[in-house]
Regions:
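Extended basic (Lys/Arg/His-rich) segments that typically form rRNA-contacting surfaces
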Residues: 1-188
Length: 188
């Protein structure tokens, strides 16, 4: 009813099919991984102008998400092909490059349209997460020119990426999540 498709998820990592283009002047990450650690409530002033409680103090439920640093493992550049996006070039820091992005690298294709950072989560830093195995995921790099995005992604290779590189305090963010999938048991 509320979720589609109604079946068990393929993996614990959510799959985003579209990245919203950003008009930021400097390159920035377009996503970050976090783990739900609980819920609580917050007292806040209702900011919605058409609400009946607009401007009044209200109590609202909030979800607490812990965001440990992610490790930037690699970088991929995509070009538009007949079947959609295809990998044009990629960088995996290796022993040859000393972990600074000079390792295994293909020639940079001039038809590149999109840059993504391959980042590894750190679930072992969060207590209460049953899996301690890291997940590898692609984070979009948006804003600035294409050359600036490539240089920004290269500068992050082999380093820890914090949530402060993605968003700032007080910003609104969209959240995509994967449920545990308890079947017919419990509330949806």
């Amino acid at each position: 009813m509320a979720y589609s498709p109604r079946k068990r998820a393929r993996s614990q990592t959510p799959h985003l099919h579209t990245l919203v283009p950003t008009d930021a002047e400097k390159p920035t990450l377009q996503g970050f991984a976090g783990y739900k650690v609980g819920m609580t409530h917050a007292l806040m002033v209702d900011y919605r102008p058409t609400s009946t409680t607009s401007g009044q103090s209200i109590q609202t439920p909030v979800t607490v998400v812990e965001t440990p640093p992610m490790k930037a493992q690699g970088m991929r550049c995509y070009r538009r092909g007949p079947q959609g996006l295809e990998v044009a070039s990629e960088i995996w820091p290796g022993k040859e490059g000393g972990g600074n992005g000079e390792g295994k690298e293909r020639e940079l294709d001039p038809t590149v349209e999109e840059v993504r950072l391959l980042a590894q989560t750190s679930p072992h830093l969060v207590s209460g997460v049953p899996s301690k195995d890291p997940n590898l995921m692609e984070l979009g790099v948006g804003g600035g020119t294409l050359v600036e995005r490539i240089e920004y992604a290269r500068s992050l290779l082999g380093k820890d990426v914090n949530v402060r590189d993605f968003t700032h305090e007080g910003d609104m963010v969209d959240v995509c999540a994967v449920t545990k999938g308890k079947g017919f048991q419990g509330a949806v």
